[in-house]
A protein has these predicted regions:
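Extracytoplasmic
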Residues: 1-196
């Protein structure tokens, strides 16, 4: 179930696209396979320290998972901007506890970045995987489901998934669920036809 090799399976392994994809994932911290987890929260959740900390912790856990190239989320960008507002000092690369300071960090992030919606009630976490092999996607999805099932912040709910890797993961789950019933129907039909 799913892909066994890196690259697009419709193309040859040495195709230009597959070579370019391998180069991008080996040289940069992003990849071409993206699974986006949607964090649903209350309106104006992006200026709530506890909500942003829950999203930052989730992103950190995902970025340390085997098969994940990197993650991008609003909390990480807000930490970078907070440092930028304070002369670029690494000591300030933190989430501010004060809502006014946190507002200063996220105000200039437009909704067109895909990191938040207009009322900050939806905050996507983009997970770039190293490849889209079935085992890699299953590992990422299992970790998201584990975190989702554990007791976390009451105002944050993590939802699977968008992006090309998210669609592939959902397809893999649907195929896995239908595999054995479909085989039973096929073998049953063949057996019934043999008895005729």
């Amino acid at each position: 179930i799913g892909d066994l090799h890196r690259g697009v399976p419709e193309l040859r392994a040495d195709s230009r696209y597959n070579r370019d994809t391998a180069l991008v994932t080996s040289k940069f911290s992003i990849g071409v396979d993206i699974l986006t987890v949607i964090a649903e929260t209350k309106p104006e959740g992006c200026v709530d320290f506890e909500v942003m900390t829950a999203i930052d912790d989730f992103s950190w856990q995902m970025s340390n998972l085997e098969g994940v190239q990197s993650t991008i989320d609003l909390a990480g960008v807000a930490r970078q901007l907070n440092a930028g507002w304070n002369e670029g000092s690494p000591k300030w690369r933190v989430l501010a506890r004060n809502p006014s300071v946190l507002t200063q960090s996220v105000t200039y992030i437009p909704t067109t970045t895909g990191l938040l919606n207009s009322d900050c009630s939806v905050i996507p976490i983009m997970i770039f995987s190293k490849d889209h092999k079935a085992e890699t996607l299953a590992r990422i999805v299992a970790e998201v489901k584990r975190i989702e099932a554990s007791p976390g912040h009451p105002d944050v709910k993590f939802r699977l998934a968008t992006g090309n890797a998210g669609v592939m993961a959902a397809t893999n789950e649907a195929v896995a669920a239908a595999q054995f019933p479909m085989l039973l129907w096929v073998f049953g039909a063949v057996a019934a036809l043999c008895l005729l």
